[in-house]
Amino acid sequence: MKFTLSTVTKCSGRLGVLGGLDRLPNLSLQTPAFIFHTKGGSIPHLSKEAMQHVSGDPSCFLHLSISNTLHMQEAIKASRITIAEFIAQSNCATLLFVRDPSEPPIPGLPEKDSLPIYTRNGRRNITLEQYMTLVETFRPDAYVPLYDGDTDASSSKKRDQKSLDRTEKFVEQCLEWHRKSDALQSSCLIGPVVGGYNEKLREQSVAFLRQSDDAFAGYLIEGLHMHGPSVARMDGSAALGIVANVCKQLPEAKVRLCFGSYDPALVLEMVAAGVDVFDTSYVYLKAAQEHRALVFSFDVTSTEQEHVTELDTTDARWAEDFGPLLPGCKCYTCQKHSRAYVHHLHNTREMLGPILLMMHNLHHYVEFFKAIRHHVANDSLPELRNHLAGQKSLPPYEPPKEEKLPMPAAQKAELMEPMEDLGEKQNKKQRA
């Protein structure tokens, strides 16, 4: 995998092209860009046919995580094919990572020589040998070595130091395994930068990885958050400071990745700081868990006075609104369906609801990144940032509370009866 840097602007980030894969030499990705977040190798809620309505080009870059692909190992091994062939995505690049950006890890202490992975069957500790055996079975186009990046702004210095020490140990062993492996000669490595919110530890992590710079096709900035919906509540300014400092130390000729469900405003800040590639977990969480459609504006020439960033499809006010989710949107959902229909699908718990929301949100995100690249090329990203900053956001999503069914009268009466003394119960038994 090769990254070609084409433009570095003064205040808008940089433009480049990611490509040069051994398996797919003609596949490329214009950056800044995103790769598609997947569950078990599939984009959540969308079939390959539905994806054609989002992006006419069937070729793309896929983000795979071992937490929801681990169960495929035995089947892929028996089939003697790559994971790209197994998930019927041979025309797509497969990038394998440790964590799923949409899933928060379960709290717990990590083992000394293993990393906890949170699968659909619960927590499982995976050793370096097990991880590299899995990578050899999958044979992805690119992968990240095993690392400990479970830190956030609340992590102690001791935890950040442990994260760095464990990661350095894992990376050294992975590099040695990779060099000796015949199965991984066509797979690229991506170096994980860890260290929490400690700038000195981040510098040490970058310095350690750059000792083997030739072995890495790019770098992944990790350890900023604990993934999942909580990313929306993180301190964006603190994370941005760490990202900007790390990007200054990384080589310009290598691609920089940073994953998480970041809101669009923070994405723009990270692009300006030098990040090249993101993921679509933000789109998935908005559609599947929050039932919200992305409607933020990225047209800086718009004269509309008020913009909102999201549309809550669960709101009863859309029950008789037969307009599209976003006026002027060219996606399949907005062209064929209305707000009232999507609201109805939510009320009836129809499977089509999240499908239509995912199609709209992904299309909107595709167009958003086109606008980002346009503004980076013209060094006008601050205009887009200011335009987005003036838009109104909905209150943070709160999951609905489970309604308790009313207790039957007979059961309630039993609970209200005074409890008998233990001695009285024994006396009754003796008399009986």
From Swiss-Prot:
<feature type="compositionally biased region" description="Basic and acidic residues">
    <location>
        <begin position="422"/>
        <end position="432"/>
    </location>
</feature>
<feature type="region of interest" description="Disordered">
    <location>
        <begin position="390"/>
        <end position="432"/>
    </location>
</feature>
<keyword id="KW-0862">Zinc</keyword>
<feature type="binding site">
    <location>
        <position position="331"/>
    </location>
    <ligand>
        <name>Zn(2+)</name>
    </ligand>
</feature>
<dbReference type="InterPro" id="IPR002616">
    <property type="entry name" value="tRNA_ribo_trans-like"/>
</dbReference>
<feature type="binding site">
    <location>
        <position position="360"/>
    </location>
    <ligand>
        <name>Zn(2+)</name>
    </ligand>
</feature>
<dbReference type="InterPro" id="IPR036511">
    <property type="entry name" value="TGT-like_sf"/>
</dbReference>
<dbReference type="GO" id="GO:0008479">
    <property type="term" value="F:tRNA-guanosine(34) queuine transglycosylase activity"/>
</dbReference>
<dbReference type="GO" id="GO:0101030">
    <property type="term" value="P:tRNA-guanine transglycosylation"/>
</dbReference>
<keyword id="KW-0819">tRNA processing</keyword>
<comment type="subunit">
    <text>Heterodimer of a catalytic subunit and an accessory subunit.</text>
</comment>
<dbReference type="GO" id="GO:0005737">
    <property type="term" value="C:cytoplasm"/>
</dbReference>
<protein>
    <recommendedName>
        <fullName>Queuine tRNA-ribosyltransferase accessory subunit 2</fullName>
    </recommendedName>
</protein>
<feature type="binding site">
    <location>
        <position position="329"/>
    </location>
    <ligand>
        <name>Zn(2+)</name>
    </ligand>
</feature>
<comment type="function">
    <text>Non-catalytic subunit of the queuine tRNA-ribosyltransferase (TGT) that catalyzes the base-exchange of a guanine (G) residue with queuine (Q) at position 34 (anticodon wobble position) in tRNAs with GU(N) anticodons (tRNA-Asp, -Asn, -His and -Tyr), resulting in the hypermodified nucleoside queuosine (7-(((4,5-cis-dihydroxy-2-cyclopenten-1-yl)amino)methyl)-7-deazaguanosine).</text>
</comment>
<feature type="binding site">
    <location>
        <position position="334"/>
    </location>
    <ligand>
        <name>Zn(2+)</name>
    </ligand>
</feature>
<comment type="similarity">
    <text>Belongs to the queuine tRNA-ribosyltransferase family. QTRT2 subfamily.</text>
</comment>
<keyword id="KW-0479">Metal-binding</keyword>
<keyword id="KW-0963">Cytoplasm</keyword>
<dbReference type="GO" id="GO:0046872">
    <property type="term" value="F:metal ion binding"/>
</dbReference>
<dbReference type="InterPro" id="IPR028592">
    <property type="entry name" value="QTRTD1"/>
</dbReference>
<dbReference type="Pfam" id="PF01702">
    <property type="entry name" value="TGT"/>
</dbReference>
<dbReference type="InterPro" id="IPR050852">
    <property type="entry name" value="Queuine_tRNA-ribosyltrfase"/>
</dbReference>
